[in-house]
From Swiss-Prot:
GO molecular function annotations of the record: ribosome binding; rRNA binding; translation initiation factor activity
HAMAP family: IF_1
Places the protein is found: Plastid, Chloroplast
Biological classification of the source: Eukaryota, Viridiplantae, Streptophyta, Embryophyta, Tracheophyta
Assembly description: Component of the 30S ribosomal translation pre-initiation complex which assembles on the 30S ribosome in the order IF-2 and IF-3, IF-1 and N-formylmethionyl-tRNA(fMet); mRNA recruitment can occur at any time during PIC assembly.
Family, similarity comment: Belongs to the IF-1 family.
Function: One of the essential components for the initiation of protein synthesis. Stabilizes the binding of IF-2 and IF-3 on the 30S subunit to which N-formylmethionyl-tRNA(fMet) subsequently binds. Helps modulate mRNA selection, yielding the 30S pre-initiation complex (PIC). Upon addition of the 50S ribosomal subunit IF-1, IF-2 and IF-3 are released leaving the mature 70S translation initiation complex.
Any one Gene Ontology cellular component term annotated for this protein: cytosol
Main location: plastid
Pfam families recorded: eIF-1a
Keywords assigned by UniProt, alphabetized: Chloroplast, Initiation factor, Plastid, Protein biosynthesis, RNA-binding, rRNA-binding
Protein name listed in UniProt: Translation initiation factor IF-1, chloroplastic
Amino acid sequence: MKRQKWIHEGLITESPSNGMFRVRLDNXDLIPSYVSGKIRRSLIRILPGDKVKIEVSRYDSTRGRIIYRLRNKDSKD
């Protein structure tokens, strides 16, 4: 049976250390998150201010895993 996950969108507020990030969700919660292995292998750079998708376990909702970095839609270059 596959584990159940919640997927949320949020904004990276800071990156304190060791690949951990603090993500502010749309409902104003602040969750520490780490980068998934596929993003790490693809060398995708995540910086404060980026919008990301994270998945949170239903069993431990105190931390999440960043699974996707959303593109900036406001840049018209």
